[in-house]
């Protein structure tokens, strides 16, 4: 994750201080940023959010947009309760951090310059481990920015 430069030129180095840590995902930039309590950016990286339409479930599956809080975390053993559809779950979601209903931030081995998930925010495994173990705690604010208007 230290070599992943995605997002460094997109996210500002500082944002208004809130007194709380923040994780921000920008679907338009395929990137995330972590900000400390003082509003200083401490890390950025590549991310992939939910795609416009998921064939296997027959509906749109973009990541929910808005401001949320992490309410549950799991470690390397975390698995989906829904996907893949054909097995009604079991898909690996290492270092998952739940922020709204079933939406999580979790590790993935593919983090393309595209939004390709069923709604979760996928980040590189080393980034997910760092976020889960070193940065995000229960109550950390998660901000999902809007998708591009024409996508």
Language model features with spans:
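A structural motif detector for short, solvent-exposed N-terminal "entry" segments of globular domains
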Residues: 2-53
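Exported/periplasmic cell-wall-interacting domains
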Residues: 2-20, 58-67, 72-151
């Amino acid at each position: 994750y230290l070599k992943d430069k995605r997002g460094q030129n997109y996210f500002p180095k500082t944002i208004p201080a809130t007194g709380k840590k923040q994780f921000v995902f920008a679907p338009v930039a395929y990137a995330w940023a972590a900000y400390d309590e003082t509003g200083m950016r401490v890390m950025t990286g590549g991310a992939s959010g939910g795609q416009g339409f998921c064939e296997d479930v027959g509906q749109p599956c973009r990541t929910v947009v808005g401001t949320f809080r992490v309410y549950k975390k799991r470690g390397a053993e975390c698995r989906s309760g829904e996907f893949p559809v054909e097995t009604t779950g079991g898909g690996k979601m290492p270092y998952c951090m739940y922020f709204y209903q079933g939406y999580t931030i979790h590790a993935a081995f593919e983090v393309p310059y595209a939004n390709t998930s069923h709604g979760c925010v996928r980040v590189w495994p080393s980034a997910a481990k760092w976020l889960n173990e070193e940065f995000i705690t229960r109550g950390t604010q998660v901000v999902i920015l809007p998708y591009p208007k024409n996508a």
